[in-house]
Each structure stands twice: as C-alpha cells, then as structure tokens.
C-alpha cells in the first residue's frame, strides 16, 4: 500500500460505542495524541475521513485546529455530526470553514445521489478539490454513468435496460462476495436485505 486512510466518519452505534469511527471525535485530546504517533511513525501517506463532530456544531472548530497540525494527503469531510447519522441536510458551512482553515486537499462526501445534487453542492462549494460518492452508489449502481452523461454530451444517459443490467451485475457480485466471507444463508440474506430496506439503511 502507498496510503493509509483513517476513518473517523463512521456513525454506526456499534462502532462509536468502542470509540472508533466518528466515536474518536468525542475524545479530541486522545485523537491528537493518536495522530501525533501515527504521523511520526508511519512511512506511508495518510488521509483522513471525518465527520464534523459527535453531538454539537461547536466541536468542529477544535477539530480543525487538530487537523491543521498534520501533513495529511487529503481530508475527506462528511459535514454531518455523528448523532445525525445520514438524516437531515449536510452542513455545507462546515465544509466552507475547513476551506478557510486548512491547506491540505479537501474532498466532499455526503448526499451525492444524482447529477442535480452534485451540481448544487459544487455551486455552493466551488473550491472542492474532489468528491467521494459512497451510499449513493449502493442506492443506484448506475450513478457514475449518469454523472458522466450529465457532464459531457458524448456520453448518453443509460437506458432502463442498461440500468437493470448494472443492478443485476452489482447484486450478483455482492451476493457472491458475501457468500464467500459469511457463514450461512441467513447472515448473507440479512446483509443483502439491508440494501433494499430503507428502515435499515443506518445499519449499512
């Protein structure tokens, strides 16, 4: 590997309960000590994915001061609090604060589900270096093709048949992968069902 990505963005309750993922943001002193050691001893490039805090918006400014100290390759920001999960609207103003405070490349993550949503975000935050698309791809495996079609006239929007083919290929690949690493059909089916059950979306 040439790069390590530290995930401080996962809001899952089971992860946060162990002070991992976004749970680490709740102990900023320990986080800073951890990053001090990692950046001192790790020979690889390091990027970080982060939320903007655990419970309150005023947690973001102290976190930015911590991130200012370290020569990270990239900071990937999902501008929601951990307690918000994936609900509500991303706090774009928090990303704008990072643009002012940090010198490292910044990547935006969160609620990119269509060409229109990407355009809105880029219009409000024109200084974004890159974007990361996560759950939007799980919801719509054809999203990348739709984004390409929206950005250039040489790429056509996928037809219904093409979208269905992509979905089937995605589903088959995912099912096969789960079957290889999980024990029993029940566990495999549970993981697959999470993709298609909106009430269980936060468990992904």
Go through each PLM region and give its residues:
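C-terminal helical cap(s) of enzyme catalytic domains, especially alpha/beta-barrels
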Residues: 140-155
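Conserved small/polar residues in nucleotide/adenosyl-binding loops
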Residues: 196-203
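Short glycine-enriched, charge-decorated loop/helix-capping segments at active-site entrances
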Residues: 19-25
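Long, well-ordered amphipathic alpha-helical subdomains in the mid-to-C-terminal portions
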Residues: 164-195
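Catalytic cores of alpha/beta
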Residues: 58-63, 112-129
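Glycine-rich beta-to-alpha transition loops that act as phosphate-gripper elements at the mouths
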Residues: 50-56, 107-116, 135-137
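Alpha/beta enzyme core
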Residues: 1-4, 8-13, 18, 30, ...
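Glycine-rich phosphate-binding active-site loops on the catalytic face of alpha/beta enzymes
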Residues: 8, 79, 127-144
């Amino acid at each position: 590997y040439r790069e390590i990505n530290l995930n401080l963005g996962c809001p899952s309750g089971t992860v946060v309960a162990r002070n991992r993922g976004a749970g680490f943001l709740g102990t900023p002193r320990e986080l800073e000590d951890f990053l001090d050691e990692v950046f001192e001893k790790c020979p690889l490039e390091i990027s970080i994915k982060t939320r903007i805090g655990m419970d309150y918006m005023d947690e973001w400014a102290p976190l930015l001061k911590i991130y200012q100290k370290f020569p990270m390759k990239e900071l990937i920001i999902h501008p929601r609090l951990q307690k918000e999960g994936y609900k509500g609207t991303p706090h774009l103003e928090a990303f704008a604060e990072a643009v002012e405070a940090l010198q490292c490349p910044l990547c935006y993550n969160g609620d990119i589900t269509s060409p229109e949503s990407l355009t809105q975000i880029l219009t409000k935050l024109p200084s974004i270096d890159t974007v990361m698309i996560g759950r939007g791809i799980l919801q719509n495996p054809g999203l990348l093709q739709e984004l390409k079609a929206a950005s250039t006239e040489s790429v056509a929007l996928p037809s219904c048949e093409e979208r269905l083919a992509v979905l089937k290929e995605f589903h088959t690949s995912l099912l096969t992968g789960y079957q290889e690493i999980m024990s029993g059909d029940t566990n495999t089916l549970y993981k697959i069902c999470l993709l298609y059950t909106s009430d269980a979306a936060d468990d992904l």
